[in-house]
Amino acid sequence: VNLSTLFFVFAFLPVSLILYLLCPRVCKNALLILVSFLFYAWGSPVYLLLLLLVTVFNYCIGRDIGNRVESEQRGAKFVLVFGVLFNLLLLGFYKYTAFAIETLNAFLPFTLNAPSPALPLGISFFTFTNLSYLSDVYHRRAPGQKNPLDFCLYVSFFPKMISGPIVEYAHIAPQLKEHPVTLDKVSDAVPMLVLGLAKKVLLADNLGTAFQSISALSPGSLSGGSAWLGAIFYSLQLYFDFSGYSDMAIGMAKLFGFDFEANFDHPYLSGSLTEFWRRWHISLGRWFRDYVYIPLGGSRVSTAKCVRNLLIVWILTGLWHGASWTFAAWGLYHGILLLLEKYPLKGVLEKTPSPIRHILTLLAVIIGWVLFFSPDFSSALFYLGRMFGAGSRAFWDSTAKYYFATNWKLLLIGILGCGPWIRTLYQRLVFSRRGLGLALSALLLVGIFLLCVPYMMNATYQSFLYAQF
């Protein structure tokens, strides 16, 4: 299932939108649920029943919590804990059982057989969606949902189902009953859809091809320069892939009358890791802040407990992305660096010139992505070793020169695309008082869209990276 396929762009989305606009108001949510289930079945038909059962379960648990929370606090808390454990155990079974058993096998004198069930599409995202609902109802941030169709739509709404953004229930609850489609929403949605699609098929997929070519090099052929180019290609690919999906999801939500909050805010312009994580995958960071970090005590505790809380959150963040120790190490890596920024290095960094802080942040993030994309620690250490001069090959050898010479234009466009300049130029065209500006902006969008079509026709398109999480 992919938002950047010809079938989705030219058939599934427009047909769904036309039916939605023609549908009577009382049936609109039911139609969106049907469309969302068809979308899910397109990508994961085996687990459609699981999605439905999980949705029914959480609806019932939420109703029970809502009925108890005012008069029976202890009972409501018991039901909340039961609901949370059920969701986490389900996620754990499908995503972490094999990982846990493989880890145990390393210490046991015998070998346990690890089950390997296929991962249900979007399970990490819809699990966090359900946990948000149960917590928000218990803490009275929003009333429990009485209408089962409205709740089903909250969980299964197809634009956010596969790769987010993770929409907290308290934010979306007021929109579930009434979400009118307006001209302003449509005018915001179309550029987000087109530019999000362009990020994916024009930038992310081509950057991914360059990264895969470097990853395919034999260990003896990988020089320091090639390794750095590969890490930069991946850093840009991941950003454009995921932010492109988020833009498309937010744009599609607007077409159906919903307002989702932004999920990215030019993270590679950050001057610190703290700032980077306020700008990257904003909905996930907000979820961990609201439902894990703050309940643990947040920053309003002793320094030792604050350190504990931050490390717990970041190890969990790493494991949320994938069931392996490299993901856990990636989370721990960022947790430690954030603690260093917060405590011993705070004064030093405040006195450091902004350009240097920006470069240091980029270096820290790129090094972290090596852990993120490496299948195991030995691969990560080998790759990092090459980046920092290990091995007998010249740093900037003929292979590195070749990859730079064949991809420098893509690299330049990618770097420029990380900033707000292209969007600012488009907005200036749109808000120009002259009709010419509006016409030029429309032509620009049409041109970008037409440029995307040949890439969508290519049968070797790549699925969105975050769909695997």
Give the role of each language-model region.
Residues 1-468:
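Membrane-embedded transmembrane alpha-helical bundles that form the catalytic cores
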